A protein has these predicted regions:
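N-terminal leader/targeting and accessory segments in enzymes
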Residues: 1-79, 83, 230, 254-259, ...
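ATP-dependent carboxylate-amine ligase
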Residues: 1-11, 21-27, 33, 37-40, ...
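Short, well-ordered alpha-helix to beta-strand connector turns
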Residues: 12, 25, 50, 64-65, ...
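Short internal beta-strands
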Residues: 51-57, 222-227, 365-366, 389-397
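Phosphate-binding loop of NTP-binding sites
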Residues: 76-227, 233-243, 295, 301-304, ...
Length: 481
């Protein structure tokens, strides 16, 4: 502690990082941010009834409130939040999944597998938070440590055995999970994303690696790594001297691996090999990369003491994840998938897989988000141009950027893009794609996945790709007889 003032004997009612959530007696942490700095809201925090404030900067002249300056407010926040909520993480088994792609599918599938044995498990991730007795929409892939500790308290009080977490690179860099010990931590893969935040790929990888090397405050009980990914293989080599390590993949040297894959638009069938035994699996998740996601979840379950080969029926029964290769059925004579793919690697995975299993053409609607990594935009366009026979580039979430500027970045210096149209209105682009699709074709609408809104500057409007597809197809069929 660098200094403190005021009376620190007051009883604290809650721990918050957003002044709008303050109730009388709150302990407010003023955290720096990319868009707003918590230090700018100190007066608001006091006016709303904060009893104490912790800052990372020297602050003077705060009336009638306890204040302290600390060197690392985020790490102090994580420790204070755990203490305030009575260390609920000690009553839970924690699993964390990090990586560019696959976090949502792996964590959701893992929860499904673990609950197959009758236990209740919580879930923290991009789509929803399942807290034991209730489920709420997600507001951040990995929330701030103050929220996380509160969610763990709800899970523990509801009798959950543990929690399955998606752990983002932002969360690791910002110490949101610092000091939480993960019984199992897994790495899926690493490809370009979030360079606008991290600066370069080495910094991005370093953020992910913090979950495994102790910089997060704790080493995981078991590290689970994808050895089909070169970064995962390197992490596995680094993790083995530190503690228990398991690997998965298609590689022959993986501890848990898949062979004899058969893929189509309905899913996958494959053999899982584990400790000298084999079991045939069927999954409704489409694509070889989803086989990797299944392997990751099975290996994490094995790290928790489950027999992964005994989970074949549970994998077959898994209904999938909203907006992750989610199939929309509205009577059309061709498959339509909604997917969250928003990097060039994810698009290549999805489109490349569909090219291999689709008898007709592969069609794609996609866009690039505003106020995010501009460098990946031409690479995303190149991926779609290489693999989709017809494509419509359109608005994703433009946010505060002009769509014209986003389109210019997407075109880059790629030259002519035959078979690709740039259509500003996303609904119109989806309509054109549906009109162009024929029996035998396959359409994937990429980028927004489970999202139900679209962001323009300071405006958020309702927009759900799945619902838009249904509305357009229903309008073309006309009124029911």
């Amino acid at each position: 502690m660098l200094g403190r003032t005021g009376d620190w004997q007051a009883r604290i009612s809650c721990v918050v990082t957003d002044s709008r959530r303050i109730i009388p007696g709150a302990l407010f942490f003023a955290l720096p941010g990319r868009r707003a700095d918590g230090h700018a809201f100190l007066d608001d925090a006091i006016a709303r009834g904060a009893a104490a404030i912790i800052t990372g900067q020297a602050v003077s002249g705060l009336p009638a409130v306890a204040a302290a300056q600390v060197a690392d407010p985020r790490r102090v926040l994580a420790e204070v939040a755990r203490r305030f909520h009575g260390h609920p993480e000690r009553a839970l088994r924690l699993t964390g999944v990090t990586g560019t792609n696959g976090k949502t599918t792996v964590s959701t599938l893992l929860r499904h597998l673990l609950q197959d044995g009758g236990e209740a498990w919580g879930l923290i991730g991009t789509v929803r938070y399942h807290l034991g007795r209730r489920s709420i929409p997600s507001f951040k892939t990995t929330p701030e440590s103050a929220d996380l500790a509160g969610f763990f308290r709800q899970m523990a009080d509801a009798g959950c055995a543990g929690a399955c977490l998606e752990v983002s690179s932002h969360a690791l860099h910002q110490d949101r999970v610092h000091g939480f010990r993960f019984d199992v931590a897994a790495f899926t893969n690493l490809t370009r994303d979030h360079i606008d935040y991290h600066g370069d790929m080495s910094a991005y990888l370093a953020a992910k690696a913090a979950l495994f090397d102790g910089r997060n405050g704790e080493l995981p009980g078991v590290a689970v790594l994808n050895v089909d990914d070169p970064h995962g293989r390197a992490l596995a080599e680094a993790c083995r001297p530190r503690g228990p390590t398991l690997t998965f993949g298609l590689s022959p040297d993986a501890d848990l691996r898949a062979t004899d894959l058969a893929l189509d638009t309905a899913g996958a069938v494959f053999t899982v090999r584990w400790q000298g035994r084999t079991q045939r699996f069927t999954s409704g998740l489409t694509g070889d990369y989803n086989v990797s996601n299944v392997l990751c979840a099975l290996t994490m379950a094995a790290a928790l003491g489950r027999d992964p080969l005994a989970l074949a029926a549970a994998v077959a029964a898994f209904p999938g994840v909203a907006g992750r290769m989610e199939r929309v059925e509205a009577g059309q004579p061709f498959p339509v998938f909604i997917d969250y793919a928003h990097t060039d690697d994810a698009l290549r995975n999805v489109l490349g897989m569909l090219r291999r299993i689709t008898p007709g053409r592969v069609l794609c609607v996609f866009g690039c988000g505003g106020d995010r990594d501009r460098g990946k935009r031409p690479a995303m366009t190149r991926a779609v141009a290489d693999l989709a026979q017809l494509a419509w580039a359109t608005a994703d979430n433009p946010r505060k950027e002009s769509l014209e500027a986003i389109f210019a970045d997407m075109r880059g210096d790629l030259g002519p893009l035959p078979g690709m149209e740039f259509v500003p209105d996303r609904r119109e682009a989806i309509g054109r794609a549906l009109a162009a699709a024929r029996p035998g074709d396959c359409l994937v609408i990429a980028g927004k996945g489970h999202e139900t809104t679209q962001e323009f500057a300071d405006t958020v409007v309702p927009f759900d790709d799945r619902q838009v597809v249904r509305e357009i197809l229903a309008a073309r069929r006309g009124p029911a007889a």
